[in-house]
Amino acid sequence: MGANLMATETSGDKKGILLETGTNEFEIVEFSIGQVNYGINVAKVREVITRTPVTNMPQAHPYIDGLFTLRGKAIPLVNLPRCLNVETNAEPKNIIVTEINNYKIGFLVENVSRIHRISWKDMEPAPEVGDQSRVVGIIKMEDRIVLLLDFETIIAEINPEINAKLTTYED
C-alpha cells in the first residue's frame, strides 16, 4: 500500500492499523467513486495497487472487467462503478485487492484516500431506501458521510457458486 494509506485517523492515539481484541473500534479503507465516499473493512483488504492491464473474459458477468495478474495469480476484477451504477467522469486508477473466505478478487475504484479508525458508535445501519443491500452502514465523518459496502453481497451477486461457499463458511 502507498504511504498515504498507512496513516490512520485516530483520536490522538497512533497505534497503527492493528487493533486490540475487544475494542469498540474497527478500521476501514476509504475510497471514492464519483462524488460518493465508500469504505471497506481493512480486515478484508490484502493490498491496494494502481490499475494494471486486464485480460477480457468472454461471457463473464457484466460487472467483471476481466482478469489481472498479481504475483503470478490471475484475479477477477470487478468494475465497482458499474456494479454500483455510479456515474463518473474520472478514470478509475486503483484496485483494492480483497480476500474474503480465501477468495481473492479485485475491485476497481477511482481513488483510495486513507485508512480510518472508526468507533462502532459512529456507524449507523443503512437506511432502507430502495435496494440498498450493498450498503451495510453509514459512517459519519466531520465533513462527509462514508458508505460501508457489503463486499460479500457483491461477490454473491457476481458468482452464486461463491455465495454458497460464503454461506457455508458462515454457518
Residue ranges of predicted features:
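An acidic, low-aromatic, low-complexity terminal/linker signal
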Residues: 1-171
